[in-house]
Amino acid sequence: MLNRVFLEGEIESSCWSVKKTGFLVTIKQMRFFGERLFTDYYVIYANGQLAYELEKHTKKYKTISIEGILRTYLERKSEIWKTTIEIVKIFNPKNEIVIDYKEI
């Protein structure tokens, strides 16, 4: 499956969606390419029970590791198509599965 993503990074910010149906987290990744430092930001989200687990994780840890699926959506204000990552699994710092969407 080409849309599966494994992502790890520092938690930059988090918030509930406007309608309180999902929890969003911005992840920051820093990496070197040669001697240049690059910083990338990714937005991940979860709905339902997984959203509450994601909120707990962001309060407890400063970093996060996830498995997710790429999702494309149309942002209504700007009418621009964007891509985000829907979380399927959350891992703790020891790489143990904390919560698996399939188990909920």
Curated annotation (Swiss-Prot):
InterPro entries on file: DUF3217, NA-bd_OB-fold
Protein name as it appears in the record: Uncharacterized protein MG376 homolog
